[in-house]
Amino acid sequence: MSKQPNSADPAEIPQDQTVLRSNTDNAPRSAIHQTLYSADTFAQHDYLAGKKLPDIARPQAGQTNWLHFVGINDAALLKHALEPYGIHELVIEDILSRKQRPKIEDYDNYLFIAAQVYHYTAAGKLNSDQVYLIIGKDFVLSFQQKPLGLFSQLRRQMSENPRGILGKNTAFLAYCLLDRIVDDYFIVLEEYNNRVEAIDKSLFKNENSDILGKIHRLKRDAVRLRRTLLPLRDVFYQLAVRVDFTIFKGESTVYLRDVYDHNMQLLESLDASRDMVLSMMDIYLSFQSNRMNQQMRVLTVITIIFMPLTVITGIYGMNFDNMPELHWHYGYFIVLGLMLCIIVGLLIFFSRRKWL
């Protein structure tokens, strides 16, 4: 096994495009990561932002070329980098787009796959990122807007143990990338389920006043994830069963069926979690309604207790001269005693009725 030097045929990159950069100051750090391998050779090269862009190494005969683009928003630079592969301008337009529904498109000599990945921020917000794959006979091009390190582990595994990839075709490499995308969803779904369980435990406690808002956010996150996983399922299904995709045939379809099965597991698990979230919302609303009823019951009891007291005080508050009770020596204490007896009697009555 030999290492390939970082040399290649010169590429005429225009002078104003020789630096990897982003169009905006707050755009992600841009980079191009290259992996070249064949049956007995392996090499990796990195072209990072802010440095002079050297000629991207051209694959030799029999080599598979994987180029991973991160945060490349410069249309001119992207067109120049993809020119040797004959990529259609509509594909480049899709790659530069911020939002694309997961899909697969078959061109003459390559497949174009659009996908989305998600991650939870430290603040608990579910963010998304676009991922694109272009799969040809001897090349795979992958694109990601944000430097989230989606394929970093795969590149590191290749570097530490290149024998695992040597001699493999682009179909196997594409399977590894697609499998990594699906595995990333398992990580997100695990975090999602942890949040569901945390809210479920605090559902009947008063320690969290924003619990309804959190349940609503979980419901919204489930809708977003499902909206992506459903079309992804169709993409994996087409890759696994369509015979006109000449890149994927034979043993590679077995691997793709495995990815399809994993995607189905994700959907089933997500549906179960979503049902649990909907149940939690119903339980929480029922709990709040029951607590409101309890409060209204207490207020009603208090109102009923004071109604006869109000009648008594109203009667003796009338301005009549001939009211004999007003002149009784113990009239005041008798009325207070009567009120107290009414209160005690009503409390005993409500207690026996279990209204308190």
Where do the model's predicted regions map?
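Hydrophobic alpha-helical transmembrane segments and their immediately adjacent juxtamembrane loops
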Residues: 261-356
